[in-house]
Amino acid sequence: MSNAITMGIFWHLIGAASAACFYAPFKKVKKWSWETMWSVGGIVSWIILPWAISALLLPDFWAYYSSFSLSTLLPVFLFGAMWGIGNINYGLTMRYLGMSMGIGIAIGITLIVGTLMTPIINGNFDVLINTEGGRMTLLGVLVALIGVGIVTRAGQLKERKMGIKAEEFNLKKGLVLAVMCGIFSAGMSFAMNAAKPMHEAAAALGVDPLYVALPSYVVIMGGGAIINLGFCFIRLAKVKDLSLKADFSLAKPLIIHNVLLSALGGLMWYLQFFFYAWGHARIPAQYDYISWMLHMSFYVLCGGIVGLVLKEWNNTGRRPVTVLSLGCVVIIVAANIVGIGMAN
């Protein structure tokens, strides 16, 4: 396995670790509605950071974006909006299926769709079937799915042991939402594929290869921001128990506390895709769709590890922790199989 591929896998791991930890600051926000908290964090992660970093990277910010036709920008934006819809469905999936089953189904579907649909759309799927390296990467995707399934099973054992149930368990509704979440969340993978002309243009301007994907986030995350912020603002305006004015009428120290924690959560959320871009840049071009598989499987891996570190698995017994550990090992094996496949 080449050093470039190894570093690509490593940066995807770092990005996934940030994704697994980003909600920790949000949990310490006090007396704010979820909608206000999510909006503040989202403004930081989807608008301020992508724009600020792109302004630093690009020699002429406005000239860069105005150089693209609508036919180039629109698919990137719409796939970003598609991914934003997946974000909204993610929370609803947890509500009706519970954390473990919801995450397992949603992540499993988005891993498959986001990884395999890209080469199909690009007409390169035959390379996966007809080459040794392609078959190895497909095997890695399958092993990753098995690992996600094992971690999901560990979560179910944990929830059963601790007596945790879904907020409003509804299998039929939950499965529909999980499938929708999985499909729509893959929009980020499709957006990155559609944004290749933007990456190439950034490279032509002398932007470091590690950073060429970052300017496209202005458009991708702009699409996601409209969906997420629109959802939050509509609820803040329509739901009687929610009030943006009330949330910002608290004591000034508490408002500052909440804003800073929400902004930190937004920063950590953004960093997952900052390092995703670094990892994506190191993956061989013919296997760039594997970035999504690495990100999603490492997200599950890091989520399990973070749970152990935070002692969320204490008092659950030996079996759930053993199953979780097995699932984490399988995901690590999957990443190595994919790495070997790309090297071939």
Curated annotation (Swiss-Prot):
Q: How does it sit in the membrane?
A: Multi-pass membrane protein
Does the UniProt entry include the keyword Transmembrane helix?
yes
* Any single Gene Ontology cellular-component annotation: plasma membrane
Q: What is its main location?
A: membrane
Would I find Cell inner membrane among this entry's keywords? Answer: yes
Where do transmembrane segments lie in this chain? 4-24, 38-58, 68-88, 101-121, 137-157, 175-195, 214-234, 259-279, 290-310, 323-343
Q: Catalysed reaction(s)?
A: L-rhamnopyranose(in) + H(+)(in) = L-rhamnopyranose(out) + H(+)(out)
Q: Which InterPro entries match?
A: L-rhamnose-proton_sym_RhaT (IPR004673)
Gene Ontology terms, MF aspect: rhamnose transmembrane transporter activity; symporter activity
The protein's UniProt keywords, in alphabetical order, are: Cell inner membrane, Cell membrane, Membrane, Sugar transport, Symport, Transmembrane, Transmembrane helix, Transport
Tell me which domain of life the UniProt entry assigns to the organism this sequence originates from. Bacteria
| Cellular compartment(s) | Cell inner membrane
Q: Which NCBIfam families match?
A: PRK13499.1-1, PRK13499.1-3, RhaT
Q: Which family does it belong to?
A: Belongs to the L-rhamnose transporter (TC 2.A.7.6) family.
Physiological role: Uptake of L-rhamnose across the cytoplasmic membrane with the concomitant transport of protons into the cell (symport system).
Listed name of the protein: L-rhamnose-proton symporter
Source species of the chain: Shigella flexneri
